[in-house]
Amino acid sequence: MTSSLNFDSLAAISSAGLPAIDAKAVAAARARQGALTKPPGSLGRLEALAEFMAGWRGTAQPKIDKAQALVFAGNHGVCAQGINPFPQEVTAQMVANFQHGGAAINQLCAVAGADLTVVALDLERPTGDFTQGPAMSEAETLSALRRGAEAVDPSADVLILGEMGIGNSTVAAALGLAVCGGEAASWVGAGTGADAAGIAHKADVVTKAVSLHRDATGMGVLAALGGREQAAICGAVLAARAARIPVILDGFICTAAVAPLHGTDPAFLDHCIVGHASREPGHTRLCEALGKDPVLRMDMALGEGSGAALALNILRSALACHNGMATFAEAGVAGG
């Protein structure tokens, strides 16, 4: 999937040459919505989701025959700062749980009809502690970007993205603060269970890290403050865009992962929707900054791609109505 993408350097990553939404397909889908046996607009966001899918798949009546779910896992050097109550070994243990079908994401993908792949990214080699220096070198960042891009199935009709990594809610807060601004306290949350003192400590760590890397810009923010799973998510988003595959991002950590793409060029994320609004306090602020309205609000904060998998059911329902309902003319119903 990397053939049409330039991963020679972070500075070379550009939206130039990437496909745009098919306006004709959107118009055709909208016309079909107007002809279906219902009052105009009565299916609310389901109609908009059908048009979104039509525009990116390039057809007035898109289908989801193949849904791919990718969960990227990585470990973070900033855990040396004591920002998480769990040891980093949990990342590998959860990867094994995913692979054996025992996690929430396994059950939710089964219900939603998504093929799940878990990609572990050098778990034995955490990134650098970003309070002391950059989390990753440019070469490490580009390698993870490529891993993410190469994991995308070009025959998929939709892509779900999730993550696993002890400490990555702190990484997400740092990325959010660096790209969108504000104060660290408004970006950090409990993550996997930090208490009030732990949250305050996370805020201090994030403040220190973002100050240290204040000169980082564009995709350089990803190298300075991100992790391998965040870079892989960005790579997958870019590869999906090249293949016109719509993307459902999960919650706070996934959305923060792509914040450097938005900071580089907001158009990078035109083919992405956010599956759910996380309970993490920074997520609402981040979605507003990125111009994304989450599909669901379920008071979740698990990660793994769980909220994105739930949102896939909504997307399937939107297309079932869009493609399966009769038009007024077909049904012989007056008013069309």
Located regions from the model:
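N-terminal loops that bind phosphate or other acidic moieties
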Residues: 2-336
